[in-house]
Design a protein with these regions (language model features):
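Membrane-interface helix starts
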Residues: 144, 176-185, 280
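Sec-dependent N-terminal signal peptides
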Residues: 1-5
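Cytosolic juxtamembrane amphipathic/interface segments immediately preceding
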Residues: 112-115, 166-180
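Alpha-helical transmembrane segments and their helix-start/interface "positive-inside/aromatic belt" motifs
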Residues: 122-123, 182-187, 215-217
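Membrane-interface helix termini and inter-helical loops of multi-pass transporters
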Residues: 206-210
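Perimembrane topogenic segments of multi-pass inner/organellar membrane proteins
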Residues: 7-155
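Hydrophobic alpha-helical transmembrane segments and adjacent short intramembrane/lumenal linkers
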Residues: 189-193, 197-204, 214-222, 226-338, ...
Length: 359
């Protein structure tokens, strides 16, 4: 158990050391901002390690469409092989409006963005993690197809997954959505395990892990949009009536529709809160671990005693953060699924009107 916690911290330090040159350590000019944002950001290649002075990377396919020259498809390694530019495209330098993005130049010499559907690091990690999730779910489904319902309870990995699935289904979906939970269970279960798998893989400090998938706001935006569609597309008449004509005093609705406006605004703030909550928590966790690891290299020029002390402290804090991030990986998946289930359940709830009998 101790080795399982120490290993990620050690491998992360080794990975960051690839980005820090001996001259930077000696002069104490380690650019923490560049290292941190380089690791949590997206990229057109996947950096594995550095062998000697040679970075070992996986070049990824670049697929772009230019209004002037049409479609282009090539590996990102072609950019480096041709001095940073290939077929009129290059990576925008630091300080540019499109820093780190693939750009081309128009007839006036200005940088413009082509239609970019390239397979980036986050995209590849998303595909790998989705395939991993698919294999896990299909293996569980295969076991249940082969065994009748009255067979003995499964053990091992299948039993663990059954416990996990039943926990999410019974404790979150069924209790929050209500009687119509079966309609939404497939989406909510998928959302939970998708977020959980991506969170866990983001903590693995070597390929194919380490990509900051759920710390990418585009990913969390799509997840929140799915919940937004599920809530509003399947909302009952009562749900929409409570938005446009809520049960509040009439003077809060006419002549100024203050409460209807607030309720309508809430349609968009709920998924927005889901998006920001997941994005911010996962991004902050990755940044905290990277900054703690950078302390080792920042203190290299401060003498062996101070450097050794800070290294020990940094490793201990990293072990603590890795253990905490394991918990956060589960909690964030749980919270996102629970809030989505609550929002869906509120949109499904029918108000019961009690009629008192007169004697």
């Amino acid at each position: 158990m101790a080795m399982a916690l120490v290993l990620p911290a050690t491998l992360q330090a080794d990975e960051i050391s690839d980005d820090v040159t001996p001259a930077e350590q000696k002069e104490n000019t380690v650019d923490v901002k560049e290292i941190v944002f380089g690791h949590i950001g997206d990229s057109y290649e996947w950096h594995i390690t550095t062998w000697g002075n040679t970075p070992v990377t996986i070049p990824l396919p670049i697929i772009v469409y230019s209004n002037r020259t049409g479609w282009h498809t090539f590996l990102s390694s072609r950019l480096e092989e041709n001095g940073g530019s290939y077929e009129g495209f290059h990576i925008a330098p630091e300080g540019s409006k499109y820093e780190g993005k693939l750009v081309e130049q128009d007839v006036a010499g200005n940088e413009i963005r082509p239609l970019d559907i390239s397979i980036t690091k986050v995209t590849l990690a998303l595909l790998i993690n989705s395939m991993l999730l698919l294999v896990i779910i299909l293996s569980v489904a295969h076991w249940y197809r082969k065994h009748p319902q009255d067979s003995a309870a499964p053990g091992g990995f299948i039993g663990f997954m059954e416990m996990f699935i039943m926990m999410v289904n019974d404790d979150i979906i069924k209790s929050c959505v209500g009687p119509k939970y079966r309609k939404f269970a497939p989406y909510l279960l998928t959302a939970f395990f998708f977020i959980f798998i991506n969170n866990l893989m983001g903590l693995v400090p070597f390929f194919p892990g380490g990509a900051n998938v759920t710390g990418n706001i585009a990913i969390t935006m799509v997840l929140a949009l799915c919940t937004f569609v599920a809530v509003n597309l399947f909302g009952t008449k009562t749900y929409w009536k409570d938005i446009f004509w809520p049960d509040v005093p009439w003077w809060l609705k006419v002549p100024v529709p203050m409460m209807p406006f607030i309720e309508f605004f809430g349609i968009f703030t709920k998924p927005f809160a889901l998006m920001i909550r997941l994005f911010a928590n996962m991004l902050a966790g990755h940044m905290a671990m990277l900054v703690l690891t950078c302390l080792i290299f920042i203190s290299a020029s401060m003498g062996p005693v101070l450097n050794g002390s800070l290294t020990v402290a940094s490793v201990l804090f990293n072990i603590f953060m890795n253990a905490l991030e394991l918990l956060v990986a589960f909690i964030q998946a749980y919270v996102f699924t629970m809030l989505s289930a609550v929002f869906i359940g509120l949109a499904q709830e029918e108000h019961k009107v009690e009629v008192k009998k007169q004697h």
